[in-house]
Every structure is written in structure tokens, then in C-alpha cells.
Amino acid sequence: MRASAVDVTIRADFQTFCAFDDETLMPDVSSLLRMAEARCEDRCVRFTPIRRRVFEMISERESGLRAYELLDLLSSERASARPPTIYRALDFLLEQGLVHRIESLNAYVACPCPDHARGFQLMICRHCGLVEEIHDHDIMQRLESTAAGHGFAIERQAIELSGLCQRCRAA
């Protein structure tokens, strides 16, 4: 669920931007864009017009977008758009922690908490496609502890939960 105004903690440099400190609402697209611009500037990487537009298209959706859906959208604006254009933009956005790849859907969703990109859970509604990101630190710590007990070092945690969102359950 998107919110036009969301109570988030944003430092001036946007390094700790996260809409999930106390809320489960996604920030609006303009907030996500400001966060992405600040993150890229802080990391001295170029947030090119194509990368920005791909990020914007992903941020406008509550559900994930597949690469070829992105290509169709971008092609309507830029006739020169080709699959490598989209995949390069997606690789960049993933590398910067600005989007997540939803493995089960082979789709992409905006990440409102790039500082927490190492560990997160995605709740995916199987009816309407809504994707909500949460951060349950207890789950992450238990998994790290269990893995360490087996001599395994977790580099990234991404848990996908499939079910029905509140809207679809009420319908």
C-alpha cells in the first residue's frame, strides 16, 4: 500500500531512509526517487535518465514488474529500448540496493530500505500481486545463529512469503 505522506525517519543524507521503522506503508514515488538519487550521489555512481526511469516505473507499482514488462513500458517512451538496456539498468539498481528481485516471480520491486538490503522478507499476495517488504530482525538473527552452528556464513537473506494480503482476505 502506497502512502502520499509517510512517517519515516530520514536523515539529511538519506543514508538511513526506511519506511518500515514503525510502519508497513511504502513511501510515495517521489520519496523513493529522492532516496535513490541521494544514495547514488553518496556512492558516486551515475543515476542516468534510463536507470531513473526504470526505477520510477518499478516504484510506481505495488506488485513486481518483470524485465519484459519494463521493456514494453520503456519502449513506449524510447523506441531505442532493448532488453540489454533494461537488464543493465536492473543490474545497477540491484547493485545499489534500490530494488529487490522476487525470485519466485522473476520480477523486481522497489526497496524502500536499502540499508537493510542484506536481510528482508517479502510478503507476496497470490491474488492481487501486492508485494510488501518487512524486516523481522528476530528471524534474521535466528537464521544467522542456526547457520553459524552449521559453519555457514549467510551473505544475504531474502525470504518470500506467499499468501493473501489484508485487502484480498477481506474481499
Feature roles, as predicted:
Residues R52-M57:
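Pre-recognition alpha-helix immediately N-terminal to the DNA-recognition helix
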Residues E95-A171:
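Non-DNA-binding regulatory cores of transcription-related proteins
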Residues R2-L32, A38, H137-A171:
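C-terminal regulatory/oligomerization modules of transcriptional regulators
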Residues E69-S75, I86:
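A short acidic, leucine-rich amphipathic alpha-helix
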Residues I86-Q96:
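Basic amphipathic alpha-helical segments that dock to polyanions
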Residues F47, R61-R66:
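Short capping segments at the starts of secondary-structure elements
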Residues S59-E62, S75:
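Short, locally clustered residues in the helix-turn-helix/winged-helix DNA-binding domain
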